[in-house]
């Protein structure tokens, strides 16, 4: 069975362990083995920095172990995805892993920024006077071509079809 690393801010949900179990169960239904970051047993002793470093190293080890990364790129604490998840996507890409993602909102980012900041529809800069990337994409251009669906299960269905066609 192919192993899928389940990247995303799901680890911050109040029921994160149960959420991870649900995601892994869905992976099994589609013939995959899900690897959830909270599967790692982390020694909680030491400074916050030391614990954080162990968490990072354990998650990186799961990325090395997996065949595919499936990332939840839904907005997290703002309009953009979780920065840790984005790091994991980049890391997996550098390892030549297959990387796919899902997010509910596929509207171009410029439209979402204009709407959330009540800007003119013709705005080219956000409230912080930074240029708003306008390639018609829902995420930064570095995420080009990895966004395959609006939800987790739909992404698994698409992966199953795509991998069976190979």
Feature-to-residue mapping (PLM):
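Conserved catalytic or regulatory cores that recognize and/or transform ribose-phosphate-containing ligands
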Residues: 1-166
